[in-house]
């Protein structure tokens, strides 16, 4: 029996408990299940935006993990981030309560839907949001489960009335290859999550399975500007693949005539599909978010819209309705006519893309780029140490804080101070500095910010909370 049919029978599905319910992926699934009428509760170590939102819907939230939290539950949902020593997992095992992985629950929600799964090392959340906007503009009402807060919805998940479901597919532990999607998007593939995959080739193999597991009537959408994705596309012959890019002249969908500023990007699109005679040009598409990487994200959404025959008007209107995603180049403050941006970038490739966007804007304003970065996880820093040394070239000044551990134990020699020392010693940048305390960033901004500057606060840890407090802190100093 399928989960979505369970409520139609006389059987009762009792309480579903989410361990780590405040996580963005877990909170989205919990919200959808709640909206479907299931009894949902969960626990997390700290209160955050997601736990507060879920509580406002009447979902019970426990702060802290404890055996008694699952006293009256029938199912426990976990993500790969939950340690096996968690007391709630131990209690569930002791009492033989079924433990369901997050991806398995997501797959169950997708099973009877025509589903779009958005994967890739970077850009998943924005792309998922853009695809959803096009579906809505086409008169469809999709269910959406995203990896970030969609600004015009104030949530990362919402229940639709149509047979379509759009979901961000997390590749961190290979469970995404089992998601029953009809349309698969791959934005890019970079060395990431190697603590799980052990080597890059295994990660690439997982993405290949993600495409080949599609039904024969489905299709994939892939960015061939990325050389690893291009090679993957070349190796797959048994599934339909629509390609996109900016630099790839052989892509089916190409952006050109690009203009970008602090608030938006405008571009034209050339569409050359094998099942369509001739070439179609769509002029002056505007997305209300800056950056070349976001243009690529929008091309993935356009590919889906074209294949599903949404029409040019719906595509343009959909992008006009897009209001961005929380923590994706989000303006949080101004000081001395400089703009402070909060961004989720925590991988070297994401940092490059974010700083390139900031530099493009700052150059037009005769300003400079000040990067304040909080590394996330010792394991990521260890695997990508050399890449982190080279990813700050578009910043004029760099400030790197201590590593946000995210529950990991320190690794000998893997420190932010060591990274700064290597950047300076190898002459990759002459303005790299170690920031002993995150609070010291206030003085950095006061001492260095001037008109036209872009101050970029980056990381996946608690730097976002700090960035969102800056407006008040800086205002008190003017």
Swiss-Prot record:
Pfam families given in the database record: Mur_ligase, Mur_ligase_C, Mur_ligase_M
Record GO biological process: cell division; cell wall organization; peptidoglycan biosynthetic process; regulation of cell shape
Annotated pathway: Cell wall biogenesis; peptidoglycan biosynthesis
Source species, domain of life: Bacteria
GO cellular component: cytoplasm
Keyword Transport carried by entry: no
Major localization listed first in the record, in broad terms: cytoplasm
EC main group: ligase
Localization of this protein: Cytoplasm
InterPro entries in the cross-refs: Mur-like_cat_sf, Mur_ligase_C, Mur_ligase_C_dom_sf, Mur_ligase_cen, Mur_ligase_N, MurCDEF_pg_biosynth, UDP-N-AcMur_Ala_ligase_MurC
Record PANTHER family: UDP-N-ACETYLMURAMATE--L-ALANINE LIGASE, UDP-N-ACETYLMURAMATE--L-ALANINE LIGASE-RELATED
Family from the record: Belongs to the MurCDEF family.
Protein's name according to its UniProt entry: UDP-N-acetylmuramate--L-alanine ligase
Organism, scientific name: Rickettsia felis (strain ATCC VR-1525 / URRWXCal2) (Rickettsia azadi)
Upper classification of the organism: Bacteria, Pseudomonadati, Pseudomonadota, Alphaproteobacteria, Rickettsiales
Name of the coding gene: murC
């Amino acid at each position: 029996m399928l989960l979505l049919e369970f409520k139609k029978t006389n059987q009762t599905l009792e309480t579903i408990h989410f361990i780590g319910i405040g996580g963005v992926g877990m909170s989205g699934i919990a919200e959808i299940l709640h909206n479907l009428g299931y009894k949902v509760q969960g626990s997390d170590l700290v209160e955050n935006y997601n736990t507060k939102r879920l509580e406002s819907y009447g979902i019970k939230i426990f702060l802290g993990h404890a055996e008694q939290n699952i006293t009256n539950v029938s199912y426990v949902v976990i993500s790969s981030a939950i340690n096996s020593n968690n007391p709630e997992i131990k209690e569930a095992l002791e009492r033989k309560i079924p433990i369901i992985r997050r991806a398995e629950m997501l797959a169950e929600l997708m099973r009877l839907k025509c589903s779009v799964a958005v994967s890739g090392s970077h850009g998943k959340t924005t792309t998922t949001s853009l695809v959803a906007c096009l579906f809505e503009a086409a008169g469809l009402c999709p269910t959406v489960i995203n990896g970030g807060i969609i600004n015009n919805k104030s949530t990362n998940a919402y229940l639709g009335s149509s047979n379509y479901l759009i979901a961000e597919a997390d590749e961190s532990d290979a469970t995404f290859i089992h998601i029953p999607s009809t349309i698969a998007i791959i934005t890019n593939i970079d060395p990431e999550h190697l603590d799980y995959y052990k080597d890059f080739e295994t990660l690439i193999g997982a993405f290949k399975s993600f495409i080949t597991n599609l039904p024969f009537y489905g299709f994939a959408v892939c960015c061939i500007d990325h050389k690893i994705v291009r090679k993957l596309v070349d190796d797959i012959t048994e599934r339909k693949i629509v390609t996109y890019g900016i630099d790839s002249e052989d892509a089916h969908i190409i952006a050109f005539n690009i203009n970008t500023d602090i608030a938006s990007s405008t571009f034209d699109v050339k569409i050359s599909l094998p099942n369509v005679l001739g070439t179609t040009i769509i002029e002056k598409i505007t997305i209300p978010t800056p950056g070349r990487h976001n243009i690529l994200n929008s091309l993935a959404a356009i590919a889906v819209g074209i294949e599903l025959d949404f029409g040019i008007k719906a595509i343009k209107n959909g992008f006009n309705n897009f209001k961005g995603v929380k923590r994706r180049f989000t303006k949080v403050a101004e000081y001395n006519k400089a703009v402070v941006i909060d961004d989720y970038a925590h991988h070297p490739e994401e940092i490059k893309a974010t700083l390139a966007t900031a530099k493009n804007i700052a150059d037009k304003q005769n300003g400079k780029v000040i990067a304040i970065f909080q590394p996330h996880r010792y394991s990521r820093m260890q695997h990508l140490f050399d890449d982190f040394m080279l990813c700050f070239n578009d910043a004029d000044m760099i400030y790197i804080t201590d590593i946000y551990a995210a529950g990991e134990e320190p690794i000998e020699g893997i420190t932010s101070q060591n990274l700064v020392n290597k950047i300076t010693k190898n002459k990759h940048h002459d303005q790299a500095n170690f920031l002993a305390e995150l609070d010291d960033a206030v003085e950095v901004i006061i001492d260095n910010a001037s008109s036209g500057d872009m101050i970029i606060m980056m990381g996946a840890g608690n730097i976002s909370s700090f960035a969102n407090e800056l407006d008040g802190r800086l205002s008190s100093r003017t």
